C-alpha cells in the first residue's frame, strides 16, 4: 500500500515525494457537523399564534395596504402545514427550502412598497435574496426560545403578517426601523420549530489507501484496465439536493427522498498504455490525459461545479455558497485558477536499452468523482486523469539492468495553456516509481 509517513505526501516506497497529495483521513464532512435544522424539516410557526404560513408562487407580487405582507396567487391555510429545512451555507446563513415542492424562500422586492418585500417560492439559484441569517433569542417573560430571520445585512427581518388571528399567515420581510420595534412587530417576527420530518441523508464512506501501481506478471499480461482498477476513497461530501440536477427525479422527490446527495472522491491508477518494446528499440506512443469538454459540461450541468486546470475545484452560482464544506469533505483544494481543465494529448518516444524484450505498462493517477443517491444508486461519475503523476511497471523486472528512457516528448494538443508543459529529456522511468511533474522538471511551453 502507498501509505503516508508524514504530511509531505507519498512515502519513499511509493516513489518520489510531492506536496498537496490527498492523505488518508477520516470523514469530517457535513452529516457530522450539521445543525439539527439542517437535518430535519420543521413545521415553522409563529411563536405567539402557533399558526402556519402561506407562501406565494406568483412572479409579480404586490403589497396590501399597510400590512407587512403581500397578496399571493396561491395560499395555504393552517390545515396544510409546511415543513422546512435550512441548508447551512459556508458563511453561516441558510437557504430555507420546502419539503413539499423542493423550492426555496425568495425575497422578491416590489416597486410598490419599499418597506415590505414578499417572500415567494422559487427554484434555487444561489442569489443573495435566497439567503437568510437566523438569530436565536428568548422571551424574557416565558423564557421560551425563538428565532428571527434577517436579510440584506440585517436591514430586513422576516415578518409573519396577521400573526395574532386564526386566518392564513402570510410571510414578508419588513424594513428594520431605528430604536425599538413596536410589540406587534416583535410578535410578527418571532418563529419557533414545531413538528418535523427527518431529512434523507446518506452515510459517508470510510477513506482508504491507494495501492501501488499494478505490476504485470508475464509478457502476455497487459495490465489492469481502468474499469477494473482498485479505487481508494479519499474524501466525500454531502451535497444539498437544491444544487444537484438528477435527470430521474423532480425537485419534490429529490427533497423528500434525497435531501442530500453523496459525492465521493476516489483515486486509482489509470492505464495509459501497455506494450511490449523489443530490445534496444524506440517506440512512439500517444498518451491522452485530463478531461474532455463533454465530461466537464456534464459535471457543470449536474453539480454546478467543475475541475480547474490545476485539478482543484471550481464552483458556479448554485454550488458556490457550499464550496468550503464540499472541498473540505472531498479532501480537495479550491482551484487557484479560473481556467477549466481540458484534454491533453502527448506523443512520447520511449527507448528500451535492455538486451531483452520487455512488457511496459504506464499508469497515471485518476481523480474520480461519483454522485450517489441515498440508497447508494450511482447517478453519474466523472474522471480526470492527472498527467503530472505517472509511473511505469514492467515484466520481467528482475533481469532488467537498464530502466526505460523517455527520449522525446511532444504535446500534440492541450486545451488550455495552463498545463502546456513538457518534460526535460532524457527522463529515466524507474520501475514502479511515481514520476511527479514539478516546476523544476518542466519546460514552459512557448506561446505561438
Swiss-Prot record:
Residues 199-448 are annotated as: Probable pore-forming domain. GO terms for biological process: sporulation resulting in formation of a cellular spore. It is found in: Spore, Perispore. GO terms for molecular function: toxin activity. Disulfide bonds join 67-161. Processed by proteases extracted from C.pipiens larval gut; unlike its partner BinA, it does not form a stable digestion product. Signal peptide: none annotated. Residues 1-198 are annotated as: Beta-trefoil domain. Forms a heterodimer with BinA. Upon toxin crystal solubilization with NaOH at pH 12, only the 63-kDa (binB) and 43-kDa (binA) proteins were detected. Interacts with mosquito protein Cpm1 which acts as its host receptor. Component of a binary toxin active against Culex and some Aedes mosquito larvae. This subunit alone has no toxic larvicidal activity. This subunit is responsible for localized binding to specific regions of the host larval gut. Binary toxin internalization into host gut cells requires both proteins. In protein gels runs as a 63 kDa protein. Belongs to the toxin_10 family. This is Binary larvicide subunit BinB.
Amino acid at each position: 500500500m502507498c501509505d503516508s509517513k508524514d504530511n509531505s505526501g507519498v512515502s519513499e516506497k511509493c516513489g518520489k515525494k510531492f506536496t498537496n497529495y490527498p492523505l488518508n483521513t477520516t470523514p469530517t464532512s457535513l452529516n457530522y457537523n450539521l445543525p439539527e435544522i439542517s437535518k430535519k424539516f420543521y413545521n415553522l410557526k409563529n411563536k405567539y399564534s402557533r399558526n402556519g404560513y402561506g407562501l406565494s408562487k406568483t412572479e409579480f407580487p404586490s403589497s396590501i395596504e399597510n400590512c407587512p405582507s403581500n397578496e399571493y396567487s396561491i395560499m395555504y391555510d393552517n390545515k396544510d402545514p409546511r415543513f422546512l429545512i435550512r441548508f447551512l451555507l459556508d458563511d453561516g446563513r441558510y437557504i430555507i427550502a420546502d419539503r413539499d415542492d423542493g423550492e426555496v424562500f425568495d425575497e422578491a422586492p416590489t416597486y410598490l412598497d419599499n418597506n415590505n418585500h414578499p417572500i415567494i417560492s422559487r427554484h434555487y439559484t444561489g442569489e443573495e435574496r435566497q439567503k437568510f441569517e437566523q438569530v436565536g433569542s428568548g422571551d424574557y417573560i416565558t423564557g421560551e426560545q425563538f428565532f428571527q430571520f434577517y436579510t440584506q445585512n440585517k436591514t430586513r427581518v422576516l415578518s409573519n403578517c396577521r400573526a395574532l388571528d386564526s386566518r392564513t399567515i402570510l410571510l414578508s420581510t419588513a424594513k428594520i426601523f431605528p430604536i425599538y420595534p413596536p410589540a406587534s412587530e416583535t410578535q410578527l417576527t418571532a418563529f419557533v420549530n414545531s413538528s418535523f420530518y427527518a431529512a434523507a441523508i446518506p452515510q459517508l464512506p470510510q477513506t482508504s489507501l491507494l495501492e501501488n501501481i499494478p505490476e504485470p506478471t508475464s509478457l502476455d499480461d497487459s495490465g489492469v484496465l481502468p474499469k477494473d482498477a482498485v479505487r481508494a476513497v479519499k474524501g466525500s461530501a454531502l451535497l444539498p439536493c437544491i444544487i444537484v440536477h438528477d435527470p430521474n427525479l423532480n425537485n419534490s422527490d429529490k427533497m423528500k427522498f434525497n435531501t442530500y446527495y453523496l459525492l465521493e472522491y476516489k483515486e486509482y491508477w489509470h492505464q495509459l498504455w501497455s506494450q511490449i518494446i523489443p530490445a534496444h528499440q524506440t517506440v512512439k506512443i500517444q498518451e491522452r490525459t485530463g478531461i474532455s469538454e463533454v465530461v466537464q459540461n456534464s459535471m457543470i450541468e449536474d453539480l454546478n461545479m467543475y475541475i480547474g486546470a490545476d485539478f482543484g475545484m471550481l464552483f458556479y452560482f448554485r454550488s458556490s455558497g457550499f464550496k468550503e464544506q464540499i472541498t473540505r469533505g472531498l479532501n480537495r483544494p479550491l482551484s487557484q485558477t479560473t481556467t477549466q481543465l481540458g484534454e491533453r494529448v502527448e506523443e512520447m518516444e520511449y527507448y528500451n536499452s535492455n538486451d531483452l524484450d520487455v512488457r511496459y505498462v504506464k499508469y497515471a493517477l485518476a481523480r474520480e468523482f461519483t454522485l450517489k443517491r441515498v440508497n447508494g444508486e450511482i447517478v453519474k461519475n466523472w474522471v480526470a486523469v492527472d498527467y503530472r503523476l505517472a509511473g511505469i511497471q514492467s515484466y520481467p523486472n528482475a533481469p532488467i539492468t537498464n530502466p526505460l528512457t523517455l527520449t522525446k516528448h511532444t504535446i500534440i494538443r492541450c486545451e488550455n495553456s495552463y498545463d502546456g508543459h513538457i518534460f526535460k529529456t532524457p527522463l529515466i522511468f524507474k520501475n514502479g516509481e511515481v514520476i511527479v511533474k514539478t516546476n523544476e522538471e518542466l519546460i514552459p511551453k512557448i506561446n505561438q
